[in-house]
Swiss-Prot record:
This is Holo-[acyl-carrier-protein] synthase. It comes from Mycobacterium tuberculosis (strain CDC 1551 / Oshkosh). One of its GO terms (cellular component) is cytoplasm. It is an enzyme of class 2 (transferase). One of its GO terms (molecular function) is magnesium ion binding. Belongs to the P-Pant transferase superfamily. AcpS family. InterPro entries: 4-PPantetheinyl_Trfase_dom, 4-PPantetheinyl_Trfase_dom_sf, ACPS, Ppantetheine-prot_Trfase_dom. Its cofactor is Mg(2+). HAMAP family: AcpS. The lineage of its organism: Bacteria, Bacillati, Actinomycetota, Actinomycetes, Mycobacteriales. The keyword Cytoplasm applies. Keywords: Cytoplasm, Fatty acid biosynthesis, Fatty acid metabolism, Lipid biosynthesis, Lipid metabolism, Magnesium, Metal-binding, Transferase. Transfers the 4'-phosphopantetheine moiety from coenzyme A to a Ser of acyl-carrier-protein. Its main location: cytoplasm.
Length: 130
């Protein structure tokens, strides 16, 4: 297997929380029901968990876009809902894809890591193909 893309995203928790509270925000539609349920089940800050997941979605998009260097984009920009960050019973994250992006990345393994420090969250995504 070889690495075909690497993406990273860094987000400010206060800025994100402010945007989530704005009327008409797209963030409610960005997260899957499972992601919203996980966020409400955690004892940490409500904005913290979705923020790391948002960063992971952005990191996956950046990794995939980077793997298509000098090629025209083939997916719409509003694909965040098709990228779901799920966790196992120990909280380890994994990416589950649906829709068109799942078809494009069918043979790709996605590795993802999330982190929080102070008022910042970050995620790294690595795409690996056979």
């Amino acid at each position: 297997m070889g690495i075909v893309g690497v993406g990273i995203d860094l987000v400010s928790i206060p800025d994100f929380a402010e945007q989530v509270d704005q009327p008409g925000t797209v963030f409610a539609e960005t997260f899957t029901p499972g992601e919203r349920r996980d966020a409400s089940d955690k004892s940490s800050s409500a904005a913290r968990l979705p923020l790391a997941r948002w960063a992971a979605k952005e990191a996956v998009i950046k990794a995939w876009s980077g793997s298509r260097f000098a090629q025209r984009p083939v997916l719409p920009e509003d694909i965040h809902r098709d990228i779901e960050v799920v966790t196992d019973m120990w909280g380890r994250p994994r990416v589950r894809l649906t829709g068109a992006i799942a078809e494009y990345l069918a043979d790709v393994t996605i590795h993802v890591s999330l982190t929080h420090e102070g008022d910042t969250a970050a995620a790294v995504a690595i795409l690996e193909a056979p």
